[in-house]
């Protein structure tokens, strides 16, 4: 009795693609992790150029350097503050 490796590979590949699509941010957006619970937010990349958001990036650099524990960009502030900042940026 043998195994059909091409079929197994195809199944595993499809599962990996499906799971990575759930975690990917849409084109033009970036996933960041915020707060003590590391809640995931997906924000427009245009926020990265805003001075208010650049202050958050500076804080992240001071606290984490380039070693982010979640593997993505981690922002060291409360979820409430982050939501307030992103709503202000979206209103501009």
Curated annotation (Swiss-Prot):
One of its GO terms (biological process) is response to auxin. Pfam families: Auxin_inducible. Induction: By auxin and cycloheximide. Belongs to the ARG7 family. This is Indole-3-acetic acid-induced protein ARG7. The gene is ARG7.
């Amino acid at each position: 009795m043998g195994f059909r490796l091409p079929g197994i590979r195809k199944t595993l590949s499809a599962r990996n693609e499906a799971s990575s699509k759930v975690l990917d941010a849409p084109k033009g957006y970036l996933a960041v992790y915020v707060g003590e619970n590391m809640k995931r937010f997906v924000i427009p990349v245009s926020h990265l150029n805003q001075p208010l958001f650049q202050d958050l990036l500076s804080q992240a650099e001071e606290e984490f350097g380039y070693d982010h524990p979640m593997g993505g960009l981690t922002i060291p502030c409360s979820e409430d503050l982050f939501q307030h900042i992103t709503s202000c940026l979206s209103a501009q």
